[in-house]
């Protein structure tokens, strides 16, 4: 087998780039596939029929202000106001039902009697917030007692103005093959989805985009004062078979309702309130909603008092005519003790501040309970993620029952607004015919051919195709209680059985116990210093034993130093149990990082891949990793992997860059160096040069792009921004022509599920669907390449945005299916193609480099250190 070491290293001639001048339109479907065995399936799409296709939605803008002109924020009060408006002024609105988005837009079926309205809406039943706590500008006990017996109505001004007309029939062309995906169609779908959200809001649900959650939605405790709850995602979708309603089970995280003190104890894993870190508590509690136990009223927390409850003073006031007159200073503790005669155990702890920045309003902790259905958006710990995944799994039949029950319970088509459109929704799932593609043949060592069964294989009694000897290596242990010598012996023994020649490690380095409590960066620096004292020469490879699985803070600094400064490949492990299977999986990763090949596709080994074998073809996987929710100071990390050693499609190199937080389009594919005509620091320059270097001095004439992480609204940006950058980078290398492109978006974050119509198991590996539930005109299909053993399988949704190469549907689907079998660190078909998976791994690993960094004070995104030349060309991310 020819490898990169035998290929010429001729330089690429570099010239200024030519203007790209390419405008691409999203391609339409070219037909459907035919290969594979047919299989009967059902899916969580429910057919929608419309008896009144000529209905027109009328859109109106809504402005809500207080009587003195202040804008009203918050969907809760806004929805309450609009409900009251409809009850009060229904006749003025001609009795028309309103679909309100909770913000600034409402819709009706047909027009309202006039284009503009000004309403005065009075909402009763609200207590005055400032009368239920104690405020620095606050009220006395006398005023508070009077407020117990009185409701305070408030008046609001609501203005409604005509904005636009949206014909419903723009989304109904799907049934006649005449669907046009323009803005009107998207607007009509949005109206229908708003109706679903409004229906859920009326039932008191928590709304998260197009999903809604009940307080009794199968709570799942995951620790830390957080619980997961199960709800439903629902959205209308245009499909090849007509309009459909897509319903799926969804899960979100909420705060566990109850006493605030109990939440803080659980969140910080402490036994008593005295152990609570109040600085952390203040950050955690900010913006949470609580209900006062001494008053039936909710508040939003803005912070904690600066002093304990028994020391925090406020001015007690009484009303003297129209004026409030201070009578004396009193502590919050004394006020509540005198007024409510209840013992207060939180006297030495801070109070909750539920007022405003210029007017604090204090409540003792034990008088406050967290209200239900408050979404928790902070990152989960590794343990919490595991518990959530385990608790939220549903087998196919269980999920089918949940969805069917929901359709019968919620009666979507009985909604007055939808009924006014003549919309009816079938109660049974859509039936669809799929195909099961034949798994590709794999090539192992000793010229062994093997065909996987249901997306799985193993290396029992098999040799790696191209093993890399491990000659100079060491083991370092960051205080994990294990026998490092035993691990090395077992690894050597396992390597022999797989064809890997492994020498004994020349050093076993244990962490100095005095640094065990130090910070992660310091621990890594001390370990590196110890290694350099013990090692005569840098090792080729290091096996690193971490103290925790998946959540170790040492991982990022360790990888950063080894890959960027030392140029040493490393494999991190946390061996809870040593077994042959565990060590085999570790060796698959090590061999890939060192430049070996574990297995190849049979058609790849024999140079027989359609449309790729004869024309130099570069395959790219692209992804962007963002920081955790709520961290706007953490830069995003863009990663692109490119194939090498053409015509192979199993070997890749990664290039990684940071970019502005939450920016989804990759902006570093082409980065010309200022004041030069030849320099390019962009991602694609690295990958083009690597392809040329390892592919017998050939430049790619075809480029296949697999893009992950973009939504349908960003498809055109991929073509106009990212493909354009790739063309410019290519032309910078001295080429006047432009390669042919095939651009495919790979999505996993969607809500379509496939089920066997005649069996309880998940759909078999290789299942593909390209009819009925796909887009009416665009080129897309669903593929479940992997075999789901736990829960319900989620297929990948592939959108073909551009196909200049000209794949037939069968050739493209089989190529994508085959690319799910080339992940060198896996012995199962992956749920998404390997290039996308590799890009995700590279972005996630390098994101750990910046874990302890943020945006600088001048707003600049920190640049990543470049990988050391010893490791940059290999698959360090495996």
Curated annotation (Swiss-Prot):
Record has Transcription as a keyword: yes
Compositionally biased region (Low complexity): 1-17
InterPro entries: ArgoL1, ArgoL2, Argonaute_N, PAZ_dom, PAZ_dom_sf, Piwi, Piwi_ago-like, RNaseH-like_sf
A single GO cellular-component term on record: ribonucleoprotein complex
UniProt subcellular location: Nucleus
Domain named Piwi: residues: 541-851
Gene3D superfamilies documented for this protein: 3.40.50.2300, paz domain (2.170.260.10), Ribonuclease H-like superfamily/Ribonuclease H (3.30.420.10)
Keywords: Nucleus, Plant defense, Repressor, Ribonucleoprotein, RNA-binding, RNA-mediated gene silencing, Transcription, Transcription regulation, Translation regulation
Residues of the PAZ domain: 259-372
Region named Disordered: 1-25
Source taxon at top rank: Eukaryota
RNA-binding among keywords: yes
Similarity section: Belongs to the argonaute family. Ago subfamily.
Function: Involved in transcriptional gene silencing (TGS). Component of the RISC complex that associate with the small interfering RNA (siRNA) pathway involved in direct cytosine methylation at endogenous DNA repeats. Required for the accumulation of specific siRNAs derived from transgene and heterochromatin-related endogenous loci. Involved in RNA-directed DNA methylation (RdDM) at specific endogenous loci. Probably not required for the accumulation of siRNAs derived from transgene inverted repeats that induce post-transcriptional gene silencing (PTGS).
Name by which UniProt lists this protein: Protein argonaute 6
Species whose genome carries this gene: Arabidopsis thaliana
Lineage of source species: Eukaryota, Viridiplantae, Streptophyta, Embryophyta, Tracheophyta
